[in-house]
């Protein structure tokens, strides 16, 4: 397949770079294949707009380290009323006025990324993190940030229709805006008092994505995904497991769906720092402790399983930009905080944890490869 061939060229090119001025590479047969299917990076462009040139440059950088996916977080609730939707939309008043992507350029961007072996996973984060939708139409809201999906609410059907129409605008028709075979439905951080309501909503959006639009649903693993040890949703989604306080990480391994290790112990970066997350990653600690089988959140809670566990399909880093619009962070500052952690995740979720190589040795090798 194209992606495998492309990643093979990265291996050859990296081998040449490592040889310095020799411009030769050893003759023979090489086998270089990933231990896990996905290496993903989530960019929150809703809280801080990132121009298209930056997204394209980031694709090229991530592809050098054989990342497979870039998730683009297109809407979010933010601070000081700064909630944004970053796509051109047919819905009056929804599109951000301080930076957005036209449908055409976003469609072209996905094809551009495919040339570099990268799949773009677009995300609409609902039913929480939805202030931008509620600000535009108050009939959708349970409060200022949560869509009203309560089973006994008069607004429920309005919300469900809104979501169906929103999905159709970007995934329907003969020339859809979202062209890749996966879509992230969000599901992050809804009020935990409404588990059954959330479960039904989860079933609804995943059915639309999978059965109507033929895409693999991806989501943040949160309440509503499981009920004790008995699944209530289908087995085809891929879940980002991020925090034990959002859902029992141990319970996820009793379900049928696949898991991406997106735990916030090492996988969350917030430029400027916020809510206990670092401004810059502790890279040496990350290198020494990151493991595909360690599902531990920033509080240390969670579960450890063996590397290579059949339910683990990859790892993910998330750049949240909680305060990015207010603390003067530029896209160059964002890159400075992410540049050196991509190789660590690439190593961990391609080859696996290397206990025989010190961080200093690893860093020297990365510096040799350059960008």
Where are these regions (language model features)?
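Short secondary-structure boundary/capping segments
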Residues: 88, 136-139, 201-202, 275-278, ...
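Extracytoplasmic/secreted cell-surface and envelope-processing proteins
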Residues: 79-82, 129-132, 193-195, 227-229, ...
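Feature activates predominantly on carbohydrate-active enzymes
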Residues: 2-150, 154-182, 208, 320-323
